[in-house]
Amino acid sequence: MAEKVDYAALKKGGFMRQKQKGCFSLRLAVVGGNLTAENIKTVAEVSEKYGHGYVHMTSRQGIEIPFIKVEDINVVKEELAKGGVGTGVCGPRVRTVTACQGSEICPSGCIDTYTLAKELDERYFGRELPHKFKFGVTGCQNNCLKAEENDVGIKGGMTV
């Protein structure tokens, strides 16, 4: 007899049902929009092996790998973890924190957005809430990340 699939638990762990029967799109955790070359290689390898070679870049600096079969979910999570890539979340939870490049890279950056995004993510990511909740960190007055479009938006600034 086939195992019963717990769709709610899968969604909580970042696996969203697709219209194709037995297939899921996996949302990955990409904190502050930052990935290492090793992370990108891992995502590409997993996508080639389990996701038809397709990767979707989301509007919130995230990555999704569609076409993952239900029977491959555990091995996909294991292979991603080996490459330092975590799964995201869906539903009424704190989502992965987004951030611009900040003072480490951008000439206009006033704050270290990536460190702040990591700290917020470590503290709040995945917490259950009544509704999905989003943080965004932008490093300066240019507001390239559009901080006000998040539930909590942080903007770097200067005192003159």
Residue ranges and their predicted role:
Residues 1-42:
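N-terminal basic/disordered segments at the start of proteins
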